[in-house]
Every structure is written in structure tokens, then in C-alpha cells.
Amino acid sequence: MPQPSRPRKGSMGFSPRKRAESEVPRIRSWASNDGAPGVQGFAGYKAGMTQVLMVNDEANSPREGMEEAVPVTVVETPPMRAVALRAYEDTPYGSKPLTEVWGREFDTSLERTLDLPNEDTFEDDAAALRDDAETGDIDDVRLITHTLPAGMRNIPKKTPDVMETRVGGGTLTDRVEFGLDLISDGGEHEISDIFRAGEYLDAAGVTKGKGTQGPVKRFGVQKRKGKHARQGYRRRIGNLGPWNPSRVRSTVPQQGQTGYHQRTELNKRLIEIGNGDEPTVDGGFVGYGEVDGPYALIKGSLPGPDQRLLRFRTAVRPSDQPRLDPEVRYVSTASNQG
């Protein structure tokens, strides 16, 4: 009988499979942007899923120009605020923060999570940052942004989610000026200022937590068959490894934490950006409620349960860019409750 040969069950690229440290996803890499300076990311809260009827605009597709049903995730995207600009310098040990410039106005809910400055030092700090940019002492700039969940009736919390978002495009001096102008004007920005319907983006979020699970569900190993199953166990692996080396290797699939991991999905297509209650299904989204404000429709599913924070960035590995502004003819409002 030939020996079966196949790749191992379960990817080692996701090790260690432990709980995420924070529900605010951490973005470690950003796309290079050669256009005008601008913010490269945004965030929203997952509401649920529905489907739309849209015209297939994929070039050279056999169904090009035909109407088709597409599943979409509805994400509520209220405006965000930028409160500070942080400058980084490259060192042999990675990028390190060099200086910060804080704005003048802050939302009252921000005091729940940050120690805000008591004095207005914006002009002096901004002048020092401009000098550092001209002399080449800094290599990158990022905005400290936050959400405003206190004004959302479907998000049961008042504490904003704080995150860093890169400023891309133009020269470093252009990016510094863009960031300073943004925070001096209050820092409010919307998803339509960053993305356009039809383009690709990357979505990051923390997946649904499933607690402790066995190796069959956690890694996808096969259940025991035949006489091996009649030994009393079907959902256990056959052994923990060889006699030598006399230890259990980390590659052995075992039971443990499943879910509540940060995952980033690449090249999710933004179908529509809107404002209002058009995508709200009859009776509201289960576990969320009604969407009545700025929203985005993303093709396909996204990680995490309803009400989970999702972060978006400009695509770092974009494939062939599809056509912008796709034609959406109908958004289904059929109830999720049957």
C-alpha cells in the first residue's frame, strides 16, 4: 500500500494561536503612495451582511455587463477625528517615535482612555516638527486617530478606540503640512475622503472567539477511522511525536485557544459608500440593529462578530484595479430573521 503524502494540517504561519492583545487591530505595514498626501486608513463597526444586485464590470469576464447578486458586509463608518501627529525615525532597531504634535480641541470622551495635554503648545511643537522634516531627522509621520462610538446607538460603549494611521503621498514635508492642517482644523475626516467606491482595500479585525477547541476543529486534522476509532477516541491525534527528540514539538496539533485572533484580509472590494438607512434589513441586523448614518458596503465577509471594530487601509498588494464607481441597482433589505 503506498504511503499517503499531503501537506500538514493547519498553517504554522499563524502561531502562536493565542488571544489578540487588543480588539483594535494593529497595522504593521502600509502601502507606498505616490499621489497627493492623505490619510491611508479608516475604521468602522461591523453591522451585518446582506446582498446587492450590481452590474459585473470585470474586464474580459464572460458575464461583463450582466446583472449578478453579490454578498456584502455592511460596515457603519461614522467620521473619525485626528488629535495628534507623531513623527518616527528609522533606527537599527526599527522605527522609533521622535516627537508629537497635539491639537487644540479634543472630544470629551477621549479623556476615558488618554491623558490629554493641559497646555496649548501646538504652534511651538509644529514649528519644531517642520524643522525636523526639513533637516531630514524624521522618516515617517502618522496620525493618532480615534472613533466616536458615544454617538452611535448600536455600539454599547462610550470609550473611543484609539489607533495610529499613516499619512502617505507626496514628500515628507508635504505629509507633515497635511497632518498639521488636519489636526489644527479639528481633525474630523470621513471614509469618502480616503477611499472611493470600486477600489480595493485591506480589512483587519479580530475574529470570533470560540474558546478552547480540540485539534480537529483547531487544525483540521482527520478524525480517526476504522479500528483506531474503536479504541475509544475519534477526535484525538494518533501520537504526540517520536521517541527522540524527547519532547513535544510546537508543530504537533493540540487543543487550545481557537478564534479571537487578529486577521487581515487583502483586496476586499469597496462596493458602495453612502449615508442613510438604505442597507438596513427589515427588523434590523441581528445583534446590531439599524444602520442610520455613514456606511460602506464591502464585497464578501469580514472577520469578527457584529459590533466588532474593523480597520481598513489602502491595499498593499493590489491586483489589477477594477473599475471605479460600480453600478449597484438594488440593495436587499430582506430580514435576517426569516
Curated annotation (Swiss-Prot):
A Pfam family hit: Ribosomal_L3
The text of the family note is: Belongs to the universal ribosomal protein uL3 family.
Quick one: a GO cellular component term?
cytosolic large ribosomal subunit
UniProt-listed PROSITE patterns: RIBOSOMAL_L3
Q: Which species expresses this protein natively? A: Haloquadratum walsbyi (strain DSM 16790 / HBSQ001)
- Region annotation (Disordered) maps to 1-37
What is this protein for, i.e. what is its function?
Answer: One of the primary rRNA binding proteins, it binds directly near the 3'-end of the 23S rRNA, where it nucleates assembly of the 50S subunit.
GO MF, any single term:
rRNA binding
Q: What keywords are annotated for this sequence in UniProt?
A: Ribonucleoprotein, Ribosomal protein, RNA-binding, rRNA-binding
GO term, biological process aspect, one: translation
Q: How does it assemble?
A: Part of the 50S ribosomal subunit. Forms a cluster with proteins L14 and L24e.
Say yes or no: keyword rRNA-binding present.
Answer: yes
Question: Does Ribonucleoprotein count among this protein's keywords?
Answer: yes
Name the InterPro entries on file.
Answer: L3_arc_euk, Ribosomal_L3_dom_3_arc_sf, Ribosomal_uL3, Ribosomal_uL3_arc, Ribosomal_uL3_CS, Transl_B-barrel_sf
Protein name as annotated: Large ribosomal subunit protein uL3
SUPFAM superfamilies named among the record's database cross-references: Translation proteins
Q: Which Gene3D superfamilies match?
A: 3.30.1430.10, Ribosomal protein L3, domain 3, Translation factors
